[in-house]
Regions:
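Active-site loop/oxyanion-hole signature of alpha/beta-hydrolase fold enzymes
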Residues: 85-126
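Conserved HGGG/HGGXW glycine-rich cap/lid loop of the alpha/beta-hydrolase fold
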Residues: 19, 23-29, 47-96
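Catalytic histidine-centered segment of alpha/beta-hydrolase-like enzymes
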Residues: 260-273
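Acidic catalytic loop of the alpha/beta-hydrolase fold
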Residues: 232-236
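Short beta-strand/loop motif that positions the catalytic acidic residue
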Residues: 221, 227-229
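Catalytic histidine neighborhood in serine/cysteine hydrolases
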Residues: 246-262
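Short alpha-helix in the alpha/beta-hydrolase fold that links the catalytic acid
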Residues: 223, 237-246
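Flexible "cap/lid" loop of the alpha/beta hydrolase fold
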Residues: 136-144, 149-181
């Protein structure tokens, strides 16, 4: 059995402070050996466990550390790796974002907040795991740090701006116009909730973002890649995981989950955990 130890910290960046949390997959202490009949000392400690590269989670457009809920702890337990998650600037418990997102915000994450988190937490090699737009950011991180990224997992990620993506965002935007709906976001983002919503809806529906794709970054991903996607994802068809798997330079596969929408890690938690654990066990990660 593994005890999961959590640590919370802040990460200073030129734009503001970020909130980060780490789930350490520390092995539970072994019971002390029973004293033997002889006077000699008991057996010494066994060989130290090799520290596998930690998993860094990148959240979706409305997400934050707290909205991962118990998934990071479960992931740490099944993979026997540390898991790190952080709130991007403007989200959750991080500082306010000073302005609007520009059309390069997905790719820029690797060079800005992500890099600061790695430095602050002393992380060298890592596994990038991202949900939705966080999956696109995970691709960018794998592309930016090919010598350090040991493996990449995308969950319900978009590889380009599909009509289904825009339709889903428009529909969600209308739902948030209903009285009380913004309060759902405020529970996690506080008085930043309106900015979080507008950063998602307005950025993705902007004409300046219409031609965005992951193509340039995908071809620079050298590590093993797993693209997980729900067959009923309201924000993207199965073209996305297939495109991700087909265009990365390293070994790749995709997993389509039946009867699953845009939240595979919530809707099909056990399947996602098993897939990631198997993938990381088999990959040179």
């Amino acid at each position: 059995m593994t005890d999961i130890v959590t640590e919370e910290t802040t990460v200073e960046t030129p734009q503001g402070r970020l909130f980060a949390k780490r789930w350490r997959a520390a092995p539970a202490p072994a019971p002390a050996p029973a004293p033997g009949p002889g006077p000699g000392p008991g057996p010494g400690p066994g060989p130290a466990r090799h520290a596998a590269a930690p998993i860094v989670l990148l959240h979706d457009s409305l997400g934050c550390v707290d909205l991962w809920r118990d998934f990071p702890a479960q992931l740490a337990r099944v993979t026997q790796r540390d898991v790190i998650a952080y709130d991007r600037l403007g989200f959750g418990r991080s500082d306010r974002h000073p302005g609007k997102l520009d059309s390069a915000f997905v790719r820029d994450e690797a060079d800005r907040a992500f890099a600061a988190v790695l430095e602050r937490l002393g992380v060298d090699a890592f596994v990038a795991v991202g949900h939705s737009v966080g999956g696109g950011m995970a691709v960018g991180c794998a592309a930016a740090y090919p010598a350090r990224c040991r493996a990449l997992v995308t969950v319900a990620a978009q590889a380009f701006v599909e009509d289904r993506t825009l339709a889903g965002i428009r529909d969600a935007g209308r739902q948030f116009d209903e009285p009380g709906q913004l309060d759902r976001l405020a529970r996690y983002h506080g008085d930043k909730a309106e900015w979080v919503l507008r950063a998602w809806v307005d950025t993705w529906l902007s004409p300046a973002f219409r031609d965005w794709t992951l193509d340039d970054d995908l071809q620079r991903v050298q590590c093993a890649t797993l693209a997980i996607h729900g067959e009923d994802d309201e924000y993207g068809s199965d073209v996305h995981p297939k495109r991700i798997a087909a265009r990365v330079a390293g070994p790749s596969s995709f997993l389509l989950l039946a009867r699953c929408g845009h939240m595979p890690h919530r809707e099909r938690t056990d399947d996602v955990l098993a897939a990631v654990a198997t993938f990381l066990r088999d990959a040179p990660a």
